[in-house]
Amino acid sequence: MSSSSSVHDKRKMLILWIGAVLVNIKSIFCDFTLDSAYAMATSYRNLSGDKMLLQMWEPHQTSAFIGTVLMKIFYLLTGGWDFSALFLQIAGVLVFGIATFFLHSFFRQYLPRDLTDYICILFLVLRPKQIPMIEFSNMLLLFSVLGSVFLASYFIKKKRVMLVLAALMDCLCVLSYPSAVVLCLFSAGLVIYFSEEKARDFFIFAGVCALSGAVYLSYLIFRSGTADLMLTVKSIMGSDDSHMRMIQSVYDYWSDTLRGVIILAAGIVLCCLLVRLKVLKTRDSRYAFVSAVFFVLSLAYCFYNEFVKGGYGSSCSFAASFFIIPMIVISALNLSKCSETEKCIYLTGIWTSAGLFLSVLVLTNLPVINVIGYMIPAAMVSLIPLYHIVPAADSEGTMRPAATLFVICFFFVLGRGILIQAYSDSTTMITGIENVVRKGPAKGIFCSYMEYYMTECNIREWDEQIREGENLLVVGYAVDSTEYMYRDSSVSHYSTINTATFNETLLDYWGRFPDKRPDVIAVACWYGELKYDEDSWMMQWIEENYPVRTDGSYFAFFRAG
């Protein structure tokens, strides 16, 4: 490779690293959603004295252990919650930055330097929900990637401490996302497949997981008692239908995926025709062209959703999800080009991602195509076979593998740079930023003008209508859970998830915890017009028991008298 070519490659890599850093800085200020608010509110409840798995019925509450510590530190330093969102966002970026450094040191031992850089850039840029805060989805990604790295390291170097660390990482995955028990099973399968002493290593792995689970369960029983703990678990399973799949909604979940499958099928047919007609002369050039067709079709579909349709819900995740599919397909077709060590790393990442996919699918209300966005470990290791698809540069100027990987990584960096996950839980382009939140926990977060204005109005009216420390219930279809923090309110709902359920289960909750019955109820409205079904059980109960109503701009406040 010539000196000028080497300098050119270094410049391209520097561009990607700078872009990845800028994306994370952008993400600190711009990518804050209702899921971010939910993570903050869960930690806030812990700090306010609500007992986990007793008074709290959030499905992901066990993931709050990192956020609770960080928010405790923040409160001790500042004495309030203003700017707390920014603090947690910065902490999340720093944690992933440190993890990226660790991953780089691991992959560098077995892979070429430029390939290692590309893999780590993907890890630094991609998130399941494209938000930087240390919340359950990011924790699941972080611990699963570390777990797969520890497993691969054990399979290669045979150091037993790595097997123990891998088991502990899987336990942390379960704390982050309870259904990640499925991931533990997949990891155990990897141990059986790769280990030379299969029985011994399986029992070591399973023993560490079982012992860790027993210790944590003992802690919960000690805090809550066996009867109360079992009752709470039963309540959690039956109280929140926002994360439960219903038969009638199966079509909604899979119809989104079907459109993507049609595009992929068209790509496969086109690729097969071109190869069959011998449009391309060599096998390697065919692989390269097949890859190009897949990626172009994927890119076109993503841009169609982002820019023609004006966003697709969690569009940034969707775009990443769709692009990951051809990466996995093409890499699997070219696995034979890899060394045995590379195959071990690849299969560990792919198998971990399969476990992640099923773990999330069990406990999510996302469309299936978005769940693929959790398969970031697969995207990372897919670069290994892709690196070998195109031969190195020769005298005729054949495209080098770095060019292919550069385009892939550049797409992800560019997409994460120009798209933001907005405060209102929508996806928009960075040009949609018009203002900044100036009060409350989200102070300092960039947003649209309406998001800024509505937050300002809500905080002002909260100060007028709600006394500090009162029991508060916020009712709406998409609740910003940080609203409970405006006046240090005690949460009167069993869950602060943004898609909380409002039904008769609340009466059971208040019956068990009378001190949680609301003093004031805030119902989403639009200048006096309620934005919640007035014929619902919740509104009928409010009107019967909380007849005194005061209308605000975006919330109506109800009191008993």
How should each PLM-predicted stretch be described?
Residues P128, F150, M162-P178, C184-G189, ...:
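Membrane-interface alpha helices of multi-pass inner-membrane proteins
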Residues I28-Y44, K51-L70, T78, D82:
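Extracytoplasmic catalytic/substrate-binding loops of multi-pass membrane glycan-assembly enzymes
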Residues R108-D114, V145-L163, S195, V329-E342:
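Membrane-interface transmembrane helices that cradle and orient dolichyl/undecaprenyl
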Residues R11, I98-L126, V161:
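Transmembrane-helix signature of polytopic, membrane-embedded enzymes
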Residues C409-A560:
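Extracytoplasmic
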